[in-house]
Amino acid sequence: MEHHNSHLLPGGSEKMYYIAHQQPMLRNEDDNYQEGYFIRPDPASLIYNTTALPADDEGSNYGYGSTTTLSGLQFETYNITVMMNFSCDDYDLLSEDMWSSAYFKIIVYMLYIPIFIFALIGNGTVCYIVYSTPRMRTVTNYFIASLAIGDILMSFFCVPSSFISLFILNYWPFGLALCHFVNYSQAVSVLVSAYTLVAISIDRYIAIMWPLKPRITKRYATFIIAGVWFIALATALPIPIVSGLDIPMSPWHTKCEKYICREMWPSRTQEYYYTLSLFALQFVVPLGVLIFTYARITIRVWAKRPPGEAETNRDQRMARSKRKMVKMMLTVVIVFTCCWLPFNILQLLLNDEEFAHWDPLPYVWFAFHWLAMSHCCYNPIIYCYMNARFRSGFVQLMHRMPGLRRWCCLRSVGDRMNATSGTGPALPLNRMNTSTTYISARRKPRATSLRANPLSCGETSPLR
């Protein structure tokens, strides 16, 4: 049985993509040609790379009836010839399409499984550090913990279900309840991230522009976080209402009764305006606020003091601390924008029928989908790299784990031996006090060694 990746359209052979919301490339099937009809839905959102559909006539092995009618879609009918002699069991072995090959599935596993693992571990560690360390319980860190919870929601529910159903199985195996929840949680997670970044920028803006004003208290910050989640849940509420299971216009899905999870809007107009509104609420408005606040903050923090104005060491330390925090949050904002903005712009462009027939579209959609899903594992890396307290919390947590503690101890012992023998980087030399007093002579050596090396192999200092 030979498989082709083309469609027979009126006036010649042309490749075409079916469009259906929230779905990726599907399988190609053209076998044993016979007269039928080609049904093309009006484009809605994402790609079906599939072939023509048969009519419900006597010569068909099966036909589309009312079971594959999609509400709100307009159909055009063409005469075509369709091949359909295949079975559900041997399809994977016979398909030569790139999206169904074993090599592509291996690539998908290698790209998405690390995101799932690193995002859960990293964001879980961020939450643990914030809530278990008293000095880390600041207003900004509460907002950062809210960001981490949103990323955990995305990584635990959306990442595995999306790549398994879209790229591995090509159908939805998780049931109707998870179909509603996964689509809902993805929108909620993005909205929470956007609104929390806005809350952080406003908190930083007030603290830097009006330093004498009362700061936002921790209690007030918890109310803001609850409000952010409530607004995100309310804004994304239409998505689980219109989500459901459906058999797409693909011969393989129809014959094998394989369902997909998608949004089924009553009309394309409603879908378009909601998608446009969601794009504005997720990106346009938050980015406008973030650009304004961080531009003013940058001018104030990096501006030089007027000549003749005194600047103490304390002022310099506070200015450096503010610059570090602003740099870290700016990095978080830039990474969020670079990861999610291309995918959401693509969602809007898919409403254009001419763009939906663009040949490289499946590859662009796959790349942008991976980029958007990968965002949930980047923030912990940024915190660890750009914030000394988070970095210290990560190190102390590693010392509490037996396997990692042994590795860290062996590494630190090796560094000390290399420094002693001169083969490695030398440890910093501390000035030794040669004068001995009565109090220093009575001091216990063990206490001195613990102060000098609080993270020794035998002891683990508590997170404070």
UniProtKB/Swiss-Prot annotation:
Residues 127-148, 211-221, 296-329, 385-464 are cytoplasmic. Coiled coil: none annotated. Its main location: membrane. The lineage of its organism: Eukaryota, Metazoa, Ecdysozoa, Arthropoda, Hexapoda. One of its GO terms (molecular function) is peptide receptor activity. Keywords: Cell membrane, G-protein coupled receptor, Glycoprotein, Membrane, Receptor, Transducer, Transmembrane, Transmembrane helix. It comes from Drosophila melanogaster. Belongs to the G-protein coupled receptor 1 family. The keyword Transmembrane helix applies. Residues 1-105, 170-189, 243-274, 351-363 are extracellular. GO terms for cellular component: membrane; plasma membrane. Glycans are attached at residues 49, 79, 85, 183. SMART domains: 7TM_GPCR_Srsx. It is a multi-pass membrane protein. GO terms for biological process: G protein-coupled receptor signaling pathway; neuropeptide signaling pathway. The keyword Nuclease does not apply. Receptor for the neuropeptides RYamide-1 and RYamide-2. The activity of this receptor is mediated by G proteins which activate a phosphatidyl-inositol-calcium second messenger system. RYamide signaling may suppress feeding behavior. The chain crosses the membrane at residues 106-126, 149-169, 190-210, 222-242, 275-295, 330-350, 364-384. This is RYamide receptor. It is found in: Cell membrane.
